[in-house]
A protein has these predicted regions:
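Residue-level recognition of oxygen-bearing side chains
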Residues: 6, 29, 46, 70
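Catalytic nucleophile serine of serine hydrolases
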Residues: 37
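Phosphopantetheinylated carrier protein domains
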Residues: 41-64
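Short, cationic-aromatic polyanion-contact patches
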Residues: 66-73
Length: 79
């Protein structure tokens, strides 16, 4: 399963299941779609545990976490 698929599955099935049927495109803003700071932390833990990529805390910034596309790019840069 690709990083994109893993992220989408986790976001839609675990973190924000109510958004699953009307989920925006991968370049849409995750915070506008309902992601909050608690869910973001859960997502970053998921990336470390399940995708096996450690994302440095000092690199967390709005442009890296604003969309599925941005997250995939950031994760792939640390593989």
């Amino acid at each position: 399963m690709s990083v994109r698929e893993q992220l989408r599955n986790y976001l839609f099935e675990t973190l924000m299941p109510a958004k699953r049927d009307a989920w925006p495109a991968d370049d849409s803003d995750l915070f506008d779609a309902g992601l909050d700071s608690l869910r973001l932390m859960q997502l970053l833990v998921f990336v470390e545990k399940e995708i096996k990529v450690t994302l440095p805390d000092h690199e967390v910034s709005p442009d890296r976490i604003e969309s599925v596309n941005a997250l995939v790019e950031w994760i792939e840069s640390h593989r």
